[in-house]
């Protein structure tokens, strides 16, 4: 109660100051300034009678009536009434302040609304689908009609056994971790900006691919066909047909060069057709070159040794990796190196031994996926032996 009364005194004193200021401009009549009134043991000084300004229609100066002064004194003596009045005034002031701030915020928002709409439109134009490495197909939304791939729990040990190691190495564990986290769902046909037919074109256009081509020229200067205009990047002698092209929108591109192959492997039209279908079937965990597909296709048609678990198949893939120069392997694996060697402080050094092991691991994983793909598409891939039932496997394709 006293707190309320103190507030009232402050308001009245302020009002008195304003009245005095106005009285200085128009000379006031003398009024008593020693009147006091007592309420609740508190003495209130009654403000001097306020003298009104001279009106235009009269020469008399009118003072505040006694009734007005009496009402003021009654209000001071009634604490509850004064408290309610102050509370209502405070609520009104607070409400007015909130409304004013809200109106200002709405005004500011309307000014920013065109900018916000522009940002929203830009976000809608951004494709939320994550891209993949090496020109592989982009991931698509879940489609139950497509084949999916799962990784077995024993995958690191299976890879170690095929490469005749005593146990999984860091490279093998890195590879399994990468393929476990990978999304194998392919992009819908025609919905992606990355065409499966142009997969290797994109890679060839990348600076690292051009660097690899130049490196190949430096390593095998005598194996290049210098006077060839159509195929300036022929491979080793006996594999001239491996340097192949593809036509997109009437423009012929030279496809990126993969590993050097032996005389038994030639990238022909059948191999290119199967390679393109393989790229469309999955979003591959590692980049796949047509040369690698060609070599795997030959192993796949072995009568008794085509199974991924067969020691002869694993040896052939390992020999392909070991026959490549370390610098060539680095260019072949490109960004896949991080998946195999690791990244940061825990990364394995890119020594010749580690690079060849990494490439061998990659080929083993991709061959198993290619094996299941081909046996699931016998109309596309003919002349295949019976599919073997694998007890141990790296991947499982569910259809």
Curated annotation (Swiss-Prot):
This is Secreted RxLR effector protein 36. The gene is RXLR36. Glycans are attached at residue 75. The keyword Disulfide bond does not apply. The RxLR-dEER motif acts to carry the protein into the host cell cytoplasm through binding to cell surface phosphatidylinositol-3-phosphate. One of its GO terms (cellular component) is host cell nucleus. It is found in: Secreted; Host nucleus. Residues 1-21 form the signal peptide. Secreted effector that completely suppresses the host cell death induced by cell death-inducing proteins.
